[in-house]
Structure formats: structure tokens, C-alpha cells
């Protein structure tokens, strides 16, 4: 697949610091792009109005541009594109992707208000409710599933669902990330893509913590580098994107 040569000719794979995602997206999109505003504000209340006003996400701008670029490439090559996100928190990443795409459908999996902190889960902050996130995103082109990720993924498999791009951003222990990845595998189309968050050894203190804990997402993606069935497409900030080859 000629994703790099066709739409990413500016050092996309290497993640060079002089590469401007914002400039690239504006030049590439015929219908424009909405500037991402994704910095958290601890003083803001957990309201639907706040969710509608911004992109509540812990992804950097570059990370969102990267996922969007892959999604838009897929939109160019097929009629409908299916995106799956495991661990959506407030839905900010899906909101960003939805507002800047035309022919993609989005499925998000999360525990939402049912989440309870535990020793084996790296998440600990307050979660939005499923109703809040759905009202913020709108139900057009969006499906939200509440429950434990592996079980939700199995349910999707039973319904013969397939996805073109899967983004795994749930529990960041190695064990949980691997379980989410393995449960997602049957859902990824041939030549589809799977992306992981928090898998850079030096990008943030969070990532360093996950690696020290049990290897975290970084260890799993490092293992995929040696897997002949997957090809690393890009690594930007804390996100790595792989293409499924078989």
C-alpha cells in the first residue's frame, strides 16, 4: 500500500520535528479542518457543554493529526471507513476525527461511569458518563459500547464487525494492552491499521511509568516490530501505527 508516497511525502514515518501536521492537513483536505483545542483545564466542570466546546483528550495535536491522516487516506481509497477506539475517556479523539471526516463511522468502547480504580488498572481520574459523551458526539455515525473492553470486542466479533483503523488507548499495562490487541485482531480488516497510545519510552513521564511497571504498550509495540504480519507505518510522539499485512 502506497500510503507514504501518496499522501505523506514529508518525512511522516521518521516523525521529523520540522514536519507540520497542521499545514499538511490544511493543504490535503478539500473541505478544511477545524483547529484542535485539546488542552485540559482542571477548573472546567464535567459538563456536556464543555465536551461540545473542545476536544477533551490527552493526545497531542501531532498524535491526532497522525490518526486523522490515516483515516482520511482510508476514506480516499474506499466508500466507507470504520474506526474503533478502545478507551475513549471523554470522546475527544473521536470528536476530532468525526468533525474532520466525511465517510467514516466511529465505534468507542469504555467503562464510562462504571469505571472503578484498581491496582491492575493504570487509569484513576474521573470518567464522563456514556450519556454525556454520546450527547457531545451525537449519535450520527457514532456507536458507544459500555463494558469491559475484551468482552465488548468479543461481542463485536460475534456480530461480524470489521474495522479499518483500531486505536487502543485503554488500560496501559502490558497485560491489558495485549489482551485488547489480541481481542481486536479478528476485527481488523486485511491491510487495516492498528494504533497504540503511550508507547514511547521517552516521550512522557506516564510512558516511563508504564514501562517500569510491566513494559506497558511500548513493550507490545516493540514485539510487533519483529512480527512479519505487521508493518510500522509511523511513530509520532506517543503513538505508533501498524498495518496488518495478513
Label every model-predicted segment.
Residues 1-56:
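Membrane-proximal basic amphipathic "stem/tether" segments
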